Amino acid sequence: MESTFHSDTLDSFPNYQENSLNTNEEQTNPLESLRDGWASSNSSSSSSLLLPDENEGNEVFGSLKGLVTQSKFGQWANKLSKSLQARRRKSESISKPRVYYSVFMAPSWVLHAEKHWEEYPHYAGYDYKDYVRLLDATKEAIAHGVFPVLISKGSSGSYFVKNKVQKNIAVFKPKDEEPYGKLNPKWTKWFHRNLFPCFFGRSCLIPNTSYLSEAAACVLDRGLGLYLVPYTSVASISSPTFNYDYFARKAFLTRNKPLPEKTGSFQQFLDGFVVASKFFAQHPWPGTRHRETREYTESVASSEDFDIFDPFLAENEIETEFWTEELRLKFRFEFEKLVLLDYLMRNTDRNLDNWMIKICYEPCDNEEYYKSINLLSTNLTPNMSANSVDPAISQTSDFWKGPHFQIGAIDNSLAFPYKHPDSWRSFPYGWLSLPRSLFTQPFTEFTRQLFLHKLTSREWWEKLSDDLRNVFNQDLDFDEKMFSRQLSLVKGQAYNIVEVLKNPLMNIYDLLELPNLYVVEDVVRIEVNEPTSANSEEAEFGLPIKRDYGSILHPSCSQTFPPYPGSQLLQATPGRSFSSNAEALLPLNYITLLSKDSSSPKMLKDVIFERLQCASSNAVFSTC
């Protein structure tokens, strides 16, 4: 490994400076070189991480390197380096088998729909090209002396990023300034960590991954086609206004040494949006008593403060000058997207101050809005027929020509837990403090069709899993087992969503009343036909090549596979029945379900069988 240390650290060795100038034509960043040394598979010893390479004639460096290498510290560093390299190579080269049996079953009216909606109607959102443009504008502004500004609210080091004209364009959250990061500039969490260790952190979340959770929320949002989360990605920025340790700050001030770049989440700034608490204070939802004097930012209120409405009688809601019937329907259309997104990624920190609302008074020219109008049932009684999924487009409707809403889901740093929260601190969703009538209406047909189509697609889940893994894999402490647990929880939440959306009369309250689940993947080796071509899935499994995730059936089975051992089914879930008898069917007995064509050559193949697992509801005293 070539030398990556600064010359000022070795002022007493002039020969090294001269030799390094002759051997290294291109100088590299010392921090990047050190990080690459820990992760590079070409590094063979820890001494290359601790000392630069010396010439054969340099006796001083030879003796120093020998002492370090032979010492216990050098041996420990060598083992640590190799273990980190092996774990990184293992996580990068992982190849999972494909899912052969899934718990997600799509209804027939979704499988046979002529039109599958891929995304919600939305306005032009930021993409990767816009993110690169904003990042370049940020670095250019910092070079001209326009530095990010610390946000006073919140418990972590978050910064408003500005361009050269002092306009907010993004929000940056460094990793080491997270709520419990070592360089958090706010003292609240320092007191929590040092004086109240019993109430430190959230045991259901992986520590120091909040910045990755922000980026993963954007990946999930784009995968579902919601466009609620502002475009977010991981970036590296350095600025004097960031919180650095004493040595980095002193080197910058005294020796003019550049400040090291900080890695964190870089999120687009939402212009023209208002936080939900202020919006509902200005425009109270109709049907709430004492709405002139009561704030919506309080905790979940009792039912006495709200009028209880019949979920199918919209006329019980009082129509105001602002909240007309059409405007209420438009807001529900956007609000249920936020509910499903938070539920799917199990956001543990959603309140009325970290999601935003914008009213657009300009006429909507988006053709997708006109296409979706007939999918919004104005009488709030959905229809499950296939014709309702692909309705006739009425271009004459002026439903979307008036004011409409946009919702921004910001601050998703405390999402994607690896286990469900303990029952003694469950982290309820903050939007539950809104009036009851927002939650008692059934989901719109557009939402039901789009979510069922995506959440029961094997290809969609495979792509989402790869995209989420690429996000969380950016951290040097990435653990594949912990990521699998995170994905298992997301799939458990998705299973509840699928089961609720199958019923056209279920609403948000019905979704939140379901038990917490995990979807566990069991790798099973089965006997299949030997493939004869590149696209030979039909010949290999005896199944059609083009099939949906929830419709994986074998010709020898009449409707579906027998119950999988160990699966736990909810008695309240209609149309499903699981067996808890482990002897009912052994995993390898699935081999008998394959094609009985003995003339075809056979081969063994690893596949995945999914099963449900209920989360423990017992309260366990642990850090929160």
From Swiss-Prot:
One of its GO terms (cellular component) is fungal-type vacuole membrane. Keywords: ATP-binding, Cell membrane, Golgi apparatus, Kinase, Magnesium, Manganese, Membrane, Metal-binding, Nucleotide-binding, Transferase, Vacuole. GO terms for biological process: endosome organization; Golgi organization; phosphatidylinositol phosphate biosynthetic process. Residues 409-429 are annotated as: Activation loop. Residues 151-157 are annotated as: G-loop. Residues 346-354 are annotated as: Catalytic loop. Belongs to the PI3/PI4-kinase family. This is Phosphatidylinositol 4-kinase lsb6. The gene is lsb6.
